[in-house]
């Protein structure tokens, strides 16, 4: 609806601009010597009054000459069409601009950039890449913008090495100007770290653990607390059979994240199992729970206490936890244990599944929610914007 309104407003502006330009530049005269507007202008108004916006667009763009004064109107129209999904028509408008030699170099470069955006929207990444590479080379004014759009292209193509190179170019350029480098509205160093981690994960998939470790370490140079790289190094150390090194990295993981998440708990279990120390998992849970009082850690610790010392000891711990750090999920776990003592199997099963499955993640940027962590939001495509919420029970409880 907003885009439709924007198009209508733009069409009105286009009509006014066309009339003004025609009036300023002189009208054609009929046989009687009277001023005459071109037929496309009248056709455009008729289409607009009939609600036929698409035909009105074509008529007004034919009537409105392309020059320095009308360029912004043409570009704005193409942008609205692109956002409406009418990419082919946006491409035609912007290609038409590039055929106009009377435009200045800056205006041609601006048209160049808009056409590249059209190609990206259409999924024509090879054509967009060539335009953007040329633009970054030819125009210092548009270099950074072109490079930022190249990141869009390389991300879509999963060409992570090319993306790393562009991110590094943005960082170097910003440093030379004493500024902070940004790409797609995020720090270029942050993007570079994720691109390196993507390369590392590809190396893991191909069985090259050494290359993966090197790439994860490279990602940590600029961002020593990068959670993704640290978790990757934990997995690499486990794969190499070095549980001690894995635990060292895991300590850094816990220091970098404000609350324990399910995948972090899985890593801890794997590390402790690899070290073959029966008490290590329990002591680690106690250590981390004392640091952050996470309900997830409390439940894991209670489960371990139940297996080692019996359910009564576990319930005592949960009751103490509930008094000191109120939590709906801890209360639900206590209720589950009470149901078990009454042998209420159906209710036990339902509540047990609720507690085990009760966790979620949310994007800070667009609000996307899911059950698993994504390093890049599937909704808004921002990197590193999804964080652990805890469970629905914790959200109801306001924690």
Task: List the predicted regions and their residue ranges.
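Structural register within alpha-helical repeat arrays
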Residues: 43, 77, 115, 150, ...
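Flexible helix-coil transition and linker loops at the boundaries of alpha-helical arrays
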Residues: 29, 98-107, 138-141, 173-189
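TPR alpha-solenoid repeat register
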Residues: 73, 107, 111, 145-146, ...
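Short coil turns that delineate tetratricopeptide repeat
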Residues: 68, 102, 106, 140-141, ...
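Alpha-helical repeat scaffolds
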Residues: 90-99, 125-135, 162-172, 209-217, ...
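N-terminal signal-anchor transmembrane alpha helix of single-pass membrane proteins
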Residues: 1-31
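Alpha-helical segment of the N-proximal tetratricopeptide repeat
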Residues: 33-69, 76, 82-86, 92, ...
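Residue at a conserved register position within TPR or TPR-like alpha-solenoid repeats
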Residues: 47, 81, 119, 154, ...
């Amino acid at each position: 609806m907003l885009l439709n309104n924007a198009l209508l407003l733009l069409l009105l502006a286009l009509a006014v601009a066309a009339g003004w330009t025609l009036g300023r530049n002189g009208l054609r005269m009929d046989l009687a010597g009277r001023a005459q507007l071109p037929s496309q202008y009248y056709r455009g108004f008729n289409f607009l009054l009939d609600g036929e916006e698409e035909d009105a667009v074509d008529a007004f763009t034919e009537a409105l000459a392309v020059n320095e004064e009308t360029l912004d109107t043409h570009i704005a129209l193409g942008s609205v069409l692109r956002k409406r999904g009418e990419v082919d028509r946006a491409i035609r408008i912007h290609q038409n601009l590039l055929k106009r030699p009377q435009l200045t170099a800056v205006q041609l470069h601006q048209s160049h950039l808009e056409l590249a955006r059209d190609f990206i929207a259409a999924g024509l990444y090879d054509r967009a890449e060539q335009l953007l590479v040329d633009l970054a080379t030819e125009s210092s004014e548009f270099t950074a913008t072109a490079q930022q759009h190249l990141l869009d292209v390389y991300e879509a193509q999963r060409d992570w090495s090319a993306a790393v190179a562009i991110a590094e170019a943005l960082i170097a350029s910003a440093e030379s100007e004493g500024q902070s480098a940004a790409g797609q509205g995020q720090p270029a160093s942050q993007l570079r770290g994720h691109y390196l981690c993507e390369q590392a994960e590809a190396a893991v998939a191909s069985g090259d653990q050494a290359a993966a470790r090197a790439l994860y370490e490279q990602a940590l140079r600029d961002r020593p607390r990068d959670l993704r790289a640290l978790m990757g190094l934990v997995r690499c150390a486990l794969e190499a059979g070095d549980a001690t090194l894995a635990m060292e990295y895991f300590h850094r993981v816990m220091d970098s994240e404000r609350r324990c998440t399910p995948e972090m708990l899985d890593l801890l279990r794997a590390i402790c199992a690899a070290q073959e120390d029966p008490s290590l998992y329990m002591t680690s849970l106690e250590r981390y729970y004392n640091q952050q009082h996470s309900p997830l850690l409390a439940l894991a610790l209670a489960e371990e206490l139940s297996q080692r010392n019996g359910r009564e000891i576990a319930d005592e711990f949960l009751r103490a936890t509930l008094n000191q750090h109120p939590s709906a999920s801890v209360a639900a776990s206590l209720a589950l244990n009470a149901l078990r003592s009454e042998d209420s199997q159906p209710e036990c099963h339902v509540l047990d599944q609720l507690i085990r499955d009760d966790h979620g993640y949310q994007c800070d940027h667009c609000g996307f929610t899911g059950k698993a962590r994504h390093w890049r939001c599937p909704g808004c495509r921002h990197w590193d914007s999804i964080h652990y919420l805890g469970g629905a029970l914790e959200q109801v409880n306001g924690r």
